[in-house]
Amino acid sequence: MAFSKQFPETTRRSFLKGAGAVSAAAVTGAAVGGFPIPAIAQAQEVTMISAENNGAALDALKAIAAGFTKESGVNVVINNMDHEAHKTAIRNYLVAGAPDVCSWFSGNRMRAFVKRGLFDDISDLFEKEKYKDVLGATAGAVTEDGKQYGLPTGGTLWGMFYRKDVFEQHGLTVPKTAEDFMAYGDKCKAAGITPIAIGTKELWPAAGWFDQMNLRINGLDKHMALMNGEMSYLDPSLTDVFDQWEAMIGKGFFTPNHTSFGWQEAAALLAQKKAGMMNLGAFLRSAFTEADLPQLAYATFPVLDAKVGHFEEFSVNSIHIPAKAKNKQGARDFLAYFYRPENLAAYLEPGGNVPPRHDLPPSKDPLVNVAVETMKTVQGTSQYYDRDSDPDMAQAGLVGFQEFMAKPDRRKAVLTRLEGTRKRIYKI
């Protein structure tokens, strides 16, 4: 028997998904991550805390849970949280009141909890289900010291999104080089539309723009050296990045007053034909009506240095078993069921996520299939500034990049401050 309960949802922004509902088979008894669960038959349950704010994807997750219950007789309790609130809550519930399964991020975000002994090693599940055979290089996103601590779920390929009809109306072409981009921006300005929609109220979109430029000017190795605290924010190799970025700001290529816009509000400008392009993930589709979605197209960020290889920003979400989970075997059984190709595909489809398994059927979403094809030519990937960096360094960087975009004359002060933060965090 399943129960349903609505939990208050915070009003903070959703990162990768649109708004959704909350489901739980929880009424009374012990607490998991701050949520009550039944005192009776807890051993026959698998508890999960998710951060799924896309309503259709959450419905798919509920359906998968129901299918698992029907097949195994084990009930799945899903407590869904706001995406942003979950980033704080997980730091508490992994220590006390852990669920059996939780959603999170792969890469450095995962490793921070692995180093603290808060995620369970599920290498046995990988071996049993032969996941390495179907994941290929993506398995590395959840691997630390040769062991696997989660399953990669959906990936987001970041890039330049635009409306095909807007490009046709104004005679615009997708910029392939730095020169193309500047010409594109000038043409947009002449047509009365903003070249690049961006909202930096939530900080991270500015860091995403930095990532794209740094990857294309300095390459992946130097970019990751900066992310890992091994390179100075005053390094001369970053001069060209900020010179070109400052030139774009000076020409008025970005949304005016962007610090007052959230990413969803900025995406609405793209949907409303008030901007030409936007650097984001396919989740910006939530700003478009169903009728307008066929107009949405993807392009890679322009090449800024032809000598630099093809690197992209590709962030991967993941699902984990906390080290303090009470029903670890039940959690493994549920993950194996959830990760079946047909189930994972049903979960990923609503959000336009790129599948981590190569044995899933083609998506109904052409943007996803374009992303899959793009990834075949990529020489390496980063995840995203705030996923690749130390959390404290990331927060300082997010604030700094927004400040630079709003007040480019503060560039030297911003970079000097970031360098001081780097030295403090990495004890240099």
Model-predicted segments: where are they?
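N-terminal secretory signal peptides
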Residues: M1-S14, S23-G29, I37
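Conserved C-terminal helix/tail region of periplasmic/extracytoplasmic solute-binding proteins
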Residues: F3, K70, E168, T377-I428
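Extracytoplasmic/periplasmic substrate-binding proteins
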Residues: A51, I64, R111, D243-N327
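Extracytoplasmic "Venus flytrap"/periplasmic binding protein-like
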Residues: A63, G67-V134, T143, D165-K176, ...
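Hinge/lid segment of periplasmic solute-binding proteins
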Residues: F105-G159, M182, W209-D211, S237, ...
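Long, aromatic- and glycine/proline-rich binding clefts that accommodate carbohydrate-like moieties
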Residues: G140-A141, A299, L348-A396, E403, ...
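Extracytoplasmic/periplasmic solute-binding protein
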Residues: Y149-T153, W158, M182-E230, A275
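Glycine-centered hinge/linker elements that transmit conformational signals in sensory
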Residues: G185-K187, M227-H258
